């Protein structure tokens, strides 16, 4: 029979315990990668999120349409003051450069050209999908055969604009999603009808879509990893006059 010194017995005991503990150690599960969503899924999530608005989503950085806003361009035409805004559209022939137009087809949703250029212009590369990125920024469906293709910059009267938000005033820097008390009955009707149009109307074709209308004065940017606070948005009333400054293909707008 072999005899071991007392210290050797203790060492053997602790080594055996360590081996046993190591053998029973829990193996951590690998971290699951984040889910990958399709463009249609991302857009659908944006619509669902925009449908339910709360005060934490109010932006204090809306661009006001005021003469003292240095980011705006103004021009006097026939003795009247006009501000330069832009429309993302797909009927360039309806916007003859240098000529006046009347929006007989209905209201036009507009944005400030400089704000769009500042927001996404630096991110574009030669192989970028410009149409898709604009669609994301403006809260429009993923690019498809019915997507807009051109941007028309035009001079419009500030008095013919309203902000499609709880507060339609265009000279403020913030708006909630709930109607303020002093809106006109006509605007209240428009606002409530547009809620139905944006979220609940029946879709009749594969290219029809609901919209992530925030009701807080900014577009919903649904691009992955982007702030959902997009561009300040404005609506030009139906049958309003405007002067077309320039029409560009979407990619050329940023050059």
Regions of interest found by a model, annotated:
Residues 1-11:
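Bacterial N-terminal signal peptides that target proteins for export
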Residues 20-23:
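C-terminal motif of bacterial Sec signal peptides marking the signal peptidase cleavage site
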Residues 2-3, 74-75, 140-146:
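A general structural signal for short secondary-structure junctions and capping/turn motifs
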Residues 90-91, 115-118, 159-162:
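Solvent-exposed loop/turn segments at secondary-structure junctions
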Residues 10-18:
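Sec-dependent N-terminal signal peptides
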Residues 27-111:
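ADP-ribose/NAD+-binding catalytic cleft of ART/PARP-like enzymes
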Residues 29, 138-255:
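Conserved NAD+-utilizing ADP-ribose enzyme module
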Residues 114-137:
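Short active-site loop/helix that positions an aromatic residue
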